[in-house]
């Protein structure tokens, strides 16, 4: 007899082994039809996996987040089924679930085209209509190897070879197609009707550019058509907001092949960058940070001592001169320790907070580069706090408050905070990890906000907190971080004199709020769709004349605005005023001032906004006060962006 406890506390008894599907059928046929999988004692399982002991069981349906993820994973297998039917010579690699969808990496001698993707999607729909059952079989290792050898699936064999301890594998059978997976998966293809293939890209086997290139097909899948439609609308809106398109349209920046992953900032984009830097400089100064500047090219010996040369060399740009090897710094931390080491510090000097707008370079694979979001050359709002163990909690709590306040200034009020704890491979004692993790957890608790654990995701040297922003499209961007590191200061001989007059190694807190300026500006462009808040707008005001007679008056107004610290330009072209207003609206300039004969005669200006609102006639002084108030609001009032 197997006793099954349901979420409401009721108990159902079954003679012998049972399954999640049988439990669902005992509750009702409607629930059984909706059953995607189950959770047995908290563990996700397939609907037909045997349950041989008393257990707590939850039914997973498409209404659950887990259910949607399972649908997406099964769609990846369905994609594999369709691809192998259409193109039997290709080799299947991996097909995981990702945010809002799935992908499959495939090795093919012939590059896939949009026409191929359309054919694959059509075949997937045809397979779904066949309404076949997805069969799971736990298969011995030798048999799995034989199956994939017969099918010529060399990448599956490599994956099996990566798991020498596995004696059996779960094989999922989609009719004649077989894929290997831990599961769970849907019991039948009827659950997979609401899907769409979305795009293709390149990828490398194991993510290494030295390996062969693969082709990646992305897709999305949902529980119902309404959710899919909403997702497609979000994707279409995201495409409109693509920072690369807007960057070109607003003359902010460009990238070119001669400098892959490096940004050519134009005057408009560089203005945004400078405003951001000046803002962060003031924030850090006001919160007790001292700003420093360290070299970009540093001798190999420092990177060897820090551990970067051994663990990170493939991501570093290197050079040599006079028989010495150097690296362009990929991060700032070892250099900051060198500054700390100049002169013996006392416990009275701690905490010592060092900030740098550090220019870093990382040799990212060319296939992974993506506008401002993934670059090779970038600047971080980087800082390191040298402190004692007892100071960790307060420093982290202060940093959390500061970080949330900064995000609020940019209009981000949905912040996700996660604490990444000790990984299996790590340095340091369990006691030091216990202390550091508790200090971070207590600091998070003191914020009064929700947060979650990410077990095993910490760095090898210490735990960390990650801050992710949710933008206006609901997308999540990981930006800020603070990491506890007792390891690097020790490797680089950092010491201070403690209260007992003994030498002690300080704790180093690595922290950033924005992450990289380049990526954060890309996020801002897409979040605002280019309609930057007044304080960030490259040009805040444009002054326009109706006829040539008002040209001098326009220039006088521009000069007055500039003296007040506003970013102002004039448009004195011999064009109709309506045309000029439309053009400057497309340039997203927040305020447009129009001067005709009446305004010149009265010494006033006619003010309208890029959203089309007419603010009427006012004096220049009144207008300056208005703009200063808007600047003070920063990004808390997101501009209307329905003028696309």
From Swiss-Prot:
Coiled coil: none annotated. One of its GO terms (biological process) is threonyl-tRNA aminoacylation. InterPro entries: aa-tRNA-synt_IIb (IPR002314), aa-tRNA-synth_II (IPR006195), aa-tRNA-synth_II/BPL/LPL (IPR045864), Anticodon-bd (IPR004154), Anticodon-bd_dom_sf (IPR036621), Beta-grasp_dom_sf (IPR012675), TGS (IPR004095), TGS-like (IPR012676). SUPFAM superfamilies: Class II aaRS ABD-related, Class II aaRS and biotin synthetases, TGS-like, ThrRS/AlaRS common domain. The keyword Signal does not apply. Catalyzes the attachment of threonine to tRNA(Thr) in a two-step reaction: L-threonine is first activated by ATP to form Thr-AMP and then transferred to the acceptor end of tRNA(Thr). Also edits incorrectly charged L-seryl-tRNA(Thr). Belongs to the class-II aminoacyl-tRNA synthetase family. This is Threonine--tRNA ligase. The gene is thrS.
